[in-house]
């Protein structure tokens, strides 16, 4: 393999039912930065059916070019179909970097593409950078159970691949001036129904009455220090008064105090709210990786040496079950 043959940064643009996923737009933001450092184009790779509007949305969010594989066989995700089409495109066009969202689709698709292309894949990255001189992707992720932060380099293989969870990076502002039909290339694909060994027989959407913590502007998060499921009710009251929602650390999830969809951290969700109130959370590295980019962090903990206190903009030393009721009273008084 000649590394010099590989040029360009690609983002797999994940769509479900004709709707682009947020993480793909976030990856365009980071991908644009990577592409500019390398002096190459940022290309969004879109697979689906009736892709015209989505293609324009990708351009308005930073893509220099869109490769659109538009076919009825690609309307819904299939491991075989998507992997084949993307691998064919990579072998033909030779990008040096390929980013994929770490969604349930991306976690299925990414390793299969990497295996077929005999290249490396760094999963669940929390940071991405470029060694411009060597054109190497520097992919950073927690390792050894979150006790270390490792930067992984795939220097001898191309394309370099990484998956990133939703919320790690920010979308670029919408720029409709970047939208142009000549930036959208509809690519021919070699795919037949027989290439797809698995079929989707039915899609059942589960309705959950739980807020998406990844979209919340205010989060009140509880950890082991909250003490009980009942004490979480006070956190819910505070969150409601502030127009936010509750979240939790892994310790609180494991004790089944709240739903697992509310977990923040390396094994949960990455969030970046305007306000993050950490209640009784010590701040293990896995948790910090999921919330440290919040605009303003308030930490409430009895232990002044807890790691969360060092990253907080405001650290309150005290019993969370005494401090939170006082905060509730103060907010109610201010609202009146």
Curated annotation (Swiss-Prot):
PROSITE patterns: ETF_ALPHA
Record has 4Fe-4S as a keyword: no
An annotated Gene Ontology molecular function: flavin adenine dinucleotide binding
SUPFAM superfamilies documented for this protein: Adenine nucleotide alpha hydrolases-like, DHS-like NAD/FAD-binding domain
UniProt xrefs under InterPro entries: DHS-like_NAD/FAD-binding_dom (IPR029035), ETF_a/b_N (IPR014730), ETF_a/FixB (IPR001308), ETF_alpha_N (IPR033947), ETF_asu_C (IPR014731), ETF_asu_C_CS (IPR018206), Rossmann-like_a/b/a_fold (IPR014729)
UniProt cofactor(s): FAD
GO BP term, pick one: fatty acid beta-oxidation using acyl-CoA dehydrogenase
Keywords attached to this entry: Electron transport, FAD, Flavoprotein, Transport
Keyword Flavoprotein annotated: yes
SMART domains for this protein: ETF
Xref: Gene3D superfamilies: HUPs (3.40.50.620), TPP-binding domain (3.40.50.1220)
Cofactor binding notes: Binds 1 FAD per dimer.
Binding site for FAD: 275-303
Purpose of the protein: The electron transfer flavoprotein serves as a specific electron acceptor for other dehydrogenases. It transfers the electrons to the main respiratory chain via ETF-ubiquinone oxidoreductase (ETF dehydrogenase).
Subunit structure: Heterodimer of an alpha and a beta subunit.
Entry's family note: Belongs to the ETF alpha-subunit/FixB family.
The name this protein goes by in its record: Electron transfer flavoprotein subunit alpha
Source organism of the structure: Clostridium acetobutylicum (strain ATCC 824 / DSM 792 / JCM 1419 / IAM 19013 / LMG 5710 / NBRC 13948 / NRRL B-527 / VKM B-1787 / 2291 / W)
Gene transcribed to yield this protein: etfA
